[in-house]
Amino acid sequence: APARVVGRRPRVLLGAAGSVATVKVPKLALALAEVADVRVVVTEKAKTFLAKAEAYDAAAWATFQASGIEVLSDADEWDAWQEIGDDVVHVELRKWADLLVVAPLSANSLAKLANGLCDDLLSCTARAWDFDKPFVVAPAMNTAMWTHPLTATHLADLRVLGVAAVPPASKKLACGDVGPGALADVPAIVTAAGAALGEAW
């Protein structure tokens, strides 16, 4: 287990991939921000769903917007780098964070992380991750995707690296199907994040 962070608040990097469950990211980020410093990285597909978060939970969205929690995406990586010697955002995020949490983790991003692909800010940060520090994922996808054999294979590959997975919940999904694949609830993800850091959150 990693040494507990001493002398300052833990730093949690929250990644969100292209799942409709991204509408829950403001609430999750706020819950984590009660106990840690938080920054958020969204994929381009996740931005589509984050834009729907206000309609999903207006109160959480308003608090999130007022919180000052930084939200980064691919454009920030490219805007920050103009010439050799400039900061590389995914490398800086790796240095900054004590913990990487990807919630929701889509089927596509799961496949990318398990196979080492790195074509956006989130996957580049994961590919550069220091595995002496904890890494937690919370998958969220349609039941058919969740039960696909490759999903178990990809999660097993991540576990070999030391990545902890918060299993999805079974419920009626956004697509109308009933079954496993829903993002775990916010308290479960926060608890897993704390456990990864040796904290009882």
Please report, for each region that a protein language model flagged, where it lies by residue:
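A cross-family phosphate/adenosyl-ligand binding-site feature
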Residues: 1-137, 142-201
